[in-house]
């Protein structure tokens, strides 16, 4: 058997092949969770899906199976520790192992900072940050025993840029970015990599109200160097890379897939040529 640290173990397109791998993706009842899970399935991975209501997963589970992959669905409430532990045990038992975890389950409440309630804050931080940590902890135990794992925490461009009305959400995603680095340092010696995939602005059910506001969309597009929001398949290559042997020496990193908006360019505010430098 080729040693795990042998650089010749994989090469070329085989480095992106997930055949034989089992991936857990949380929050797969809709939106980005389904985009990410679909990409992993197309790359060869078998899938374990989760949502607070298992009934919401039936259609997507059938879609995954139609691709020739194994799939199983379980209930998971990431705000409940007992639910996390039960899910981790069920997921391990389903196909005998877990190679990949995509920590995707999340939520948001958009409000001006002065209107954010105590409950709003707790909902967002408990779901996005605390939930991600304890799901990773529960799943990583088996990965560490087997000496192999790929953990992908889903972050956001809001972890590196400030957006009005997204204070608690940005804080939760900034926490995910830091947590990713800490867990990478903790678990690297066991053969487990931990990285963060941070999408920019994508059209999802969670933010569809925003995209109904033409003025807001025009403002957003002007800030994105690539002049469009993200499309569902724009995340495919990134998640497969982080889940595969291609990223075998990559850990603790945040990969932004955001069309360049995190460069900080604010084109809408720059309408005139730059002034000549003065002496």
Model region roles, listed by residue range:
Residues 116, 162-170, 182, 206-207:
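Active-site loop-to-helix junction immediately N-terminal to the catalytic Tyr of the SDR YXXXK motif
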Residues 112-113, 117-125, 220:
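Substrate-binding pocket helix/loop in short-chain dehydrogenase/reductase
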Residues 136, 172:
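Active-site helix of classical SDR
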């Amino acid at each position: 058997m080729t040693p795990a640290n042998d650089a010749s173990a994989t090469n070329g397109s085989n480095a992106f092949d997930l055949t034989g791998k089992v991936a857990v993706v949380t929050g797969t009842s809709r939106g980005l969770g389904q985009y990410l899970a679909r990409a992993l399935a197309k790359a060869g991975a078998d899938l374990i899906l989760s949502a607070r209501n298992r009934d919401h997963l039936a259609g997507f589970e059938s879609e995954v199976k139609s691709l020739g992959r194994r799939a199983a669905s379980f209930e998971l409430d990431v705000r409940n520790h007992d639910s996390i532990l039960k899910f981790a045990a069920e997921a391990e038992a389903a196909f005998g192992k877990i190679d990949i975890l995509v920590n995707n389950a999340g939520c948001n409440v958009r409000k001006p900072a002065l209107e954010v309630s105590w409950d709003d804050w707790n909902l967002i931080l408990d779901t996005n940050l605390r939930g991600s940590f304890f799901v990773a902890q529960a799943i990583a135990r088996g990965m560490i025993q087997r000496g192999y794992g790929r953990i992908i925490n889903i972050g956001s461009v809001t972890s590196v840029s400030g957006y009005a009305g997204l204070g608690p959400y940005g804080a939760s995603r900034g926490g995910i970015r830091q947590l990713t680095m800490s867990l990478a340092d903790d678990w690297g010696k066991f053969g487990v990599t931990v990285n963060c995939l941070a999408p920019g602005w994508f059209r999802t059910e969670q933010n569809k109200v925003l995209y109904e506001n033409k003025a807001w969309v025009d403002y957003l597009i002007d800030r994105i160097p690539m002049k469009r929001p993200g499309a569902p398949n724009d995340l495919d290559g990134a998640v497969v890379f982080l889940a595969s042997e291609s990223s075998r020496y990559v850990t603790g990193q945040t990969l932004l897939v955001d069309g360049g908006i995190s460069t900080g360019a604010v084109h809408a505010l720059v309408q005139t040529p730059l002034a000549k430098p003065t002496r």
